[in-house]
Amino acid sequence: SGTTQENAGIILSNQDTQKWKIEKVGAAHDFFIQNAGGDIALKIDQARIVTLPAQPSFQVRKSGNQDNLAANDSAQTITFDTEVFDGNSDFTGNSFTAPVAGKYMLSINTYLASIDIDAAYILVGINTSNRSYYRLVAPKFTGDLNYYGINFSVVADMDASDTAYVFYQQSGGAAQIDLAASNGTHFSGYLLG
């Protein structure tokens, strides 16, 4: 520890076991808080930009279409197979698991193709352990559509170990609607606090 060294800091310990280190590092004067293993919990650079490397955050997308979605008025899980990023490794399979209780910003963007106007409704939603959020469309257009986008964001209250996943539900019409991957079907989220 010290105040004038290039790498100056404070070590917090309990009975001679290092628990946390608060340190100013290098000529850039970046400020770090690290755990005993050296993992950075918080970084503040000289421009006052704060980063939290392990902050729960993710974005996933589809690498291929999910074709001919069922039209039987039951929810079906939208599958995701490509992680763009997963800041704390909390996304597995097709769902995000909250590592801690808090408010989470969750967003879904879907690109639907071959929309059937005979469907009574189409909805895309985010289901969490506490509740469901969704956007509903009653496709009363003059003819079938080549494509249609459904997207929304929500701030969800989640407890530790709660899960969130995306679902699709269609009532009536033909099972002809495809969830296209190439034009931006993705699911993302991050911990607000």
Which ranges hold each PLM region?
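Extracellular jelly-roll beta-sandwich "head" domains, especially the C-terminal globular C1q domain
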Residues: 42-193
